[in-house]
Amino acid sequence: MSERSYYDILGVSKSANDEEIKSAYRKLAIKYHPDKNKGNKESEEKFKEATEAYEILRDPKKRQAYDQFGKAGVSGGAGGFGQGAYTDFSDIFGDFGDIFGDFFGGGRSSGFGGGRRSGPQRGSDLRYNLEVSLEDAALGREYKIEIPRLESCVDCNGSGASKGSSPATCPDCGGSGQIRRTQGFFSVATTCPTCRGKGTIISNPCRSCGGQGLQEKRRTINIKIPPGVETGSRLKVSGEGEAGPNGGPHGDLYVVTHIKKHELFERQGNDLILVRKISLAQAILGAEIEVPTIDGKKAKMKIPEGTESGQVFRLKGHGMPYLGAYGKGDQHVIVKIEIPKKITRRQRELIEEFARESGENIPGSKGKIFTK
């Protein structure tokens, strides 16, 4: 597949609106349609290129993900345009009836068959946004989540027909779900109006699901969050999506993590940033202090004499773990010298003496130092 951007493939700008994208795709689809260019592999590839680009750019969520992350951001949702994708184009063109209707005589149609397949179909994938604390992202944790999803009706086993009956083959389309006809260069298939593309008709529908074969249920799932996840990490749970029509298999569930803001730590990649206050005496004389770490423990850190406010110290290996790999990032500690707002008389005298020893001239200092 071409490495060109989807915008370049369709010949539109990144700011193109829906109508411009649709119009550009319409022209390319008609020009490179395989039924019009039989045996031409180059046209076939260009047709698939254009279809892949349109499939992403016509969907606001997919387009946003593509604009932000490129093809990597939509690699799981582009419909799979690799080897063997040509035979599955009926799935894609089932959604493109509005484009081809003008050229193929109305209805949801395409040279690849248009309407829905009559046999079992794979269910839709689901997405679940999960908020995760920074501690859980560092250590890993098992979450219990509840999702609404379509499941096969238990009363009819997904057939849509009531007990004691079964779906019958549609007499008009012979079970294909499509009515075919030829127009010029194009072999056009429109959705069968009798069975609405299913290939079967149900004379006695199941009362529980209304003949759909699917019911919405709520399912509780345990999700293991591995150490090192970050905002935008996507965890795939196979077979936990929605059940497919006509007894088809379940799709997949994608859990997308969103890391909550922490009151102490700021995350930068796999490193953690912590601001730690120290006293004036500790900054001048040096000290050994304890700082919190993301695992809930304390780490000892040496403050050398003469430390300045804003100085950064590194605690190696105390950051976030690398997802799916060994090792951790570092924890960077920014020290801030805390100046007392109130001091005792004795402390004032000592500071004034310190100032004189340092050769500092502080006019009118008596009674005014550190008073606010």
Curated annotation (Swiss-Prot):
* GO terms classed as biological process: chaperone cofactor-dependent protein refolding; DNA replication; protein refolding; response to heat
- Cite the binding residues for Zn(2+) 2: 170, 173, 192, 195
Spell out the molecular function terms from Gene Ontology. ATP binding; heat shock protein binding; unfolded protein binding; zinc ion binding
Record's keyword annotation contains Metal-binding? yes
**Family per record:** Belongs to the DnaJ family.
Protein name (record): Chaperone protein DnaJ
Q: How is the cofactor bound?
A: Binds 2 Zn(2+) ions per monomer.
| Every J domain range | 5-70
Q: Which residues bind Zn(2+) 1?
A: 153, 156, 206, 209
Per the record, the major location class is cytoplasm
The record's listing under HAMAP family reads: DnaJ
What does this protein's UniProt record list under function?
Answer: Participates actively in the response to hyperosmotic and heat shock by preventing the aggregation of stress-denatured proteins and by disaggregating proteins, also in an autonomous, DnaK-independent fashion. Unfolded proteins bind initially to DnaJ; upon interaction with the DnaJ-bound protein, DnaK hydrolyzes its bound ATP, resulting in the formation of a stable complex. GrpE releases ADP from DnaK; ATP binding to DnaK triggers the release of the substrate protein, thus completing the reaction cycle.
Please tell me one Gene Ontology term that the record gives under cellular component: cytoplasm
Q: Does the keyword Repeat apply?
A: yes
Q: How are the domains described in the entry?
A: The J domain is necessary and sufficient to stimulate DnaK ATPase activity. Zinc center 1 plays an important role in the autonomous, DnaK-independent chaperone activity of DnaJ. Zinc center 2 is essential for interaction with DnaK and for DnaJ activity.
**Compartments where found:** Cytoplasm
Assembly notes? Homodimer.
Q: Which UniProt keywords apply?
A: Chaperone, Cytoplasm, DNA replication, Metal-binding, Repeat, Stress response, Zinc, Zinc-finger
Tell me which species this is from. Answer: Leptospira interrogans serogroup Icterohaemorrhagiae serovar Lai (strain 56601)
Domain of life per record:
Bacteria
Segments forming CR-type zinc fingers = 140-218
Q: Where are the CXXCXGXG motif repeats?
A: 153-160, 170-177, 192-199, 206-213
